[in-house]
């Protein structure tokens, strides 16, 4: 079935999958980090229809790879492409794990209006790159052993102290892959997009 992008959406959503700290393996659409984001994209399309355009971002390689920041080139291109195609339409970012780190760095751009960070792999105070006008929501499972809920909570605390509209939501017993508490992860994502859409319509 061919999915047609809406001609005049009110909001654009970039979905940023996870990865790992160091790997030059090619990023493929059927790897687990990509697969776990497709239900988010599908539920957003189903709920909001033509009001929202959704793009699943694909990187070239699977890893962040130190100072190479490997995914950023492809994420920035995706942001540039969608803002060029839909000028003036605000962008919401949804990123899991490494994708949450990508999202924090992309959120330095003024075209970004909101960021949902799901169990983000935030390093070196990535959240400090987020510009003050971005609404930030971060979810983190308390049983996550891959990334650090306390660091996410610290980042949100710093953003709040800066005056940013930022919210931290702990998921009790939640793990890193988001395979538990599915309705909570998905429900919060839909609420996030709904609020972002309302904000876009009242700008």
Predicted region positions:
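Short beta-strand immediately N-terminal to the catalytic nucleophile in serine-hydrolase-like folds
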Residues: 93-95, 118, 139
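C-terminal catalytic histidine-bearing segment of alpha/beta-hydrolase fold enzymes
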Residues: 153, 160-203
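Short, surface-exposed "cap/lid" segments of acyl-processing enzymes
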Residues: 1-49
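Short beta-strand/loop motif that positions the catalytic acidic residue
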Residues: 132, 137-144
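Gly/Ala-rich beta-loop-alpha elbow adjacent to hydrolase catalytic centers
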Residues: 94-99, 103
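Alpha/beta-hydrolase active-site loop
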Residues: 65-85
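Conserved alpha/beta-hydrolase "acid-adjacent" motif
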Residues: 145-151
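A conserved short beta-strand
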Residues: 111-122
């Amino acid at each position: 079935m061919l999915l047609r992008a809406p001609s005049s959406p009110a909001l654009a959503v970039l979905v940023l999958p996870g990865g790992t700290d160091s790997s030059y393996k090619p990023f493929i659409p059927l790897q687990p980090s990509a697969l776990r984001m497709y239900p988010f994209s599908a539920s957003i399309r189903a709920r909001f229809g033509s009001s929202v355009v959704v793009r699943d971002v694909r990187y070239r390689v699977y890893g962040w790879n130190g100072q190479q920041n490997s995914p950023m080139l492809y994420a920035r291109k995706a942001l540039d492409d969608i803002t060029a195609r839909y000028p003036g339409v605000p962008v919401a970012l949804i990123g899991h794990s490494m994708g949450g780190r990508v999202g924090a760095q992309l959120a330095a751009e003024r075209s970004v209006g909101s960021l949902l960070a799901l169990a983000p792999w935030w390093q070196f105070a990535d959240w400090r790159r987020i510009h003050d006008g971005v609404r930030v929501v971060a979810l983190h499972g308390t049983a996550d052993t891959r990334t650090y809920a306390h660091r996410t909570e610290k980042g949100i605390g710093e953003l709040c102290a800066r005056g940013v509209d930022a919210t931290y939501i702990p998921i009790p017993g939640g793990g890193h892959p988001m395979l538990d508490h599915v309705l909570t992860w998905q429900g919060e994502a839909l609420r996030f997009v709904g609020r972002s859409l309302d904000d876009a319509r009242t700008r």
